[in-house]
């Protein structure tokens, strides 16, 4: 039976409904994916590097991220860039172009990165909850009570919330979640920027130095470690490559998806870099050598304290949902592996229906899912309580994800996809870029781990108060 020609207009070449994304929707998705809690540590990062190296390094990272993103956009289709087989995710592209072994390595790095991000988000959320409590306590006491408190109860509160949310299957697919995340991230970032500008105006002077935090405020060794760690913090702020292919999969064609995506990447990187520059530089200008690891906590108990409360509440709301966005892929992977290995186990595969008053459909409970997901959240919470160092964790995450996910795999896929000849000028330049970024990742990782070790010397697990 012949299918009427107009019917084809509803579907793309892979049989899926026709994609409708444009340059502007793709740009919006990228900006939403990039701007997040990483913006909070940029003032500290610039503070370690100074007025010359800080903005220069940020521009360098933005260029590398943009260039590697253009390489990755050419890998959306395997083979022919216009009519080749589509890759729906970053992992699909790695498996299709580079093959099984590197696919497994990429998966391991990606899941480690996701796990680390859930730990970082637990720490960041607890800091913001504690900041709200301390702010109100300080003002209620008229400034007489320093309101020292432990972050542990707030981490536990966050953990309990995540245990409940983690039982909702495919929570990360809820349509309004990304909208709420975008609104919240722009809210706290904009408030941080505005308060930085206000603080600079109140100081009447731009603080900071050309070379960053001065020797004396820290030792020579600490200066080196902090400089390295700052690279990791900036790298974390630009970590979005793993979602680029998925964003590209929403773009319509013609023109070719890669062409649209390159324009969208250029727009979004320009916008986010400008925003990052403003937030980081204004934070450093406001606090100088005392620029805090988390920008919003640096404003302490300044008025308007209610505005800081709004910003910190926005962080908590954002991170409650963002935790699930990063945890759910790990849940799905582990549960898929368990089902494949134990297909006949009721513990793994059987679902029990529970009727909940007020809901039409029964809630389906799987014993393995309930226990495993709860255990995962407990583990991330305990690790956060053992190492509640936001800056150090962000630096480690930036180091872990930047070179392999943002540079190495896109470069290798592009070389394979475009059949770039070994030892040609282009091949050599791409390998030099990859090696240079590997060095940055290594020193950032070393600096961040050194930061953790230094913090652990004075930190008593489960006992330290702020």
UniProtKB/Swiss-Prot annotation:
Keyword Ligase: no
Regulation acting on activity, per entry: Inhibited by 2,4-dinitrophenol.
Cross-referenced Pfam families: Aa_trans (PF01490)
Main location as per UniProt: membrane
Keywords: Amino-acid transport, Cell membrane, Membrane, Symport, Transmembrane, Transmembrane helix, Transport
Cytoplasmic side: 1-22, 65-111, 199-226, 288-290, 335-369, 414-435
Residue ranges annotated as Extracellular topological domain: 133-177, 248-266, 312-313, 391-392, 457-466
Membrane topology: Multi-pass membrane protein
Similarity section: Belongs to the amino acid/polyamine transporter 2 family. Amino acid/auxin permease (AAAP) (TC 2.A.18.2) subfamily.
Name the record gives this protein: Amino acid permease 4
Lineage: Eukaryota, Viridiplantae, Streptophyta, Embryophyta, Tracheophyta
């Amino acid at each position: 039976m012949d299918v009427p020609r107009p019917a084809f207009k509803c579907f793309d070449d892979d049989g899926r409904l026709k994609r409708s994304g444009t340059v502007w929707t793709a740009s919006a998705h990228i900006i939403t994916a990039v701007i997040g809690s990483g913006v909070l540590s940029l003032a500290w990062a610039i503070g370690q590097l100074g007025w010359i190296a800080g903005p220069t390094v940020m521009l360098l990272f933005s260029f590398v991220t943009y260039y590697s993103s253009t390489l990755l956009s050419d890998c959306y289709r395997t083979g022919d860039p216009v009519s080749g087989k589509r890759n729906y995710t970053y992992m699909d592209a790695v498996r299709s172009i580079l093959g099984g072994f590197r696919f497994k390595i990429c998966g391991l790095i990606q899941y480690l990165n996701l796990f680390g991000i859930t730990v970082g988000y637990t720490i960041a959320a607890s800091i913001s909850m504690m900041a709200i409590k301390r702010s109100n306590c300080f003002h209620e006491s008229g400034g007489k009570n320093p309101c020292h408190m432990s972050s542990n109860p707030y981490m536990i509160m966050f953990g309990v919330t995540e245990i409940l949310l983690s039982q909702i299957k495919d929570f990360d697919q809820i349509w309004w979640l990304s909208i709420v995340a975008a609104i919240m991230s722009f809210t706290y970032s904009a408030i941080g920027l505005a308060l930085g500008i206000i603080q600079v105006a109140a100081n009447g002077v731009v603080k900071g130095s050309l070379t960053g935090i001065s020797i004396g405020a820290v030792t020579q060794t600490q200066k080196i470690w902090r400089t390295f760690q700052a690279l990791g913090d900036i790298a974390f702020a630009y970590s979005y490559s793993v979602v680029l292919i998925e964003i590209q999969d929403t773009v319509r064609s013609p023109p070719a998806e890669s062409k649209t995506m390159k324009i969208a990447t250029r727009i979004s990187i320009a916008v986010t870099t400008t925003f990052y520059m403003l937030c980081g530089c204004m934070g450093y200008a406001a606090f100088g050598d005392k620029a805090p690891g988390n920008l919003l906590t640096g404003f302490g108990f300044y008025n308007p304290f209610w505005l800081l409360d709004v910003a910190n509440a926005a962080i908590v709301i954002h991170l409650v949902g963002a935790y699930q966005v990063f945890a759910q892929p790990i849940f799905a992977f582990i549960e898929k592996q368990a089902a494949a290995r134990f297909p006949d186990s009721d513990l793994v595969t059987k679902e029990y229906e529970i009727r909940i008053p007020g809901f039409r459909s029964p809630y389906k409970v799987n014993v393995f899912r309930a226990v495993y997901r709860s255990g995962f959240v407990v583990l991330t919470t305990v690790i956060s309580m053992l190492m509640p160092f936001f800056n150090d964790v962000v630096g480690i995450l930036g180091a872990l994800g930047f070179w392999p996910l943002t540079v190495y795999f896109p470069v290798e896929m592009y070389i394979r996809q475009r059949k770039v000849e070994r030892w040609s000028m282009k091949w050599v330049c791409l390998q030099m870029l990859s090696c240079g970024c590997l060095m940055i990742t290594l020193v950032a990782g070393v600096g961040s781990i050194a930061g953790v070790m230094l913090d652990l010397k004075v930190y008593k697990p489960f006992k330290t108060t702020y």
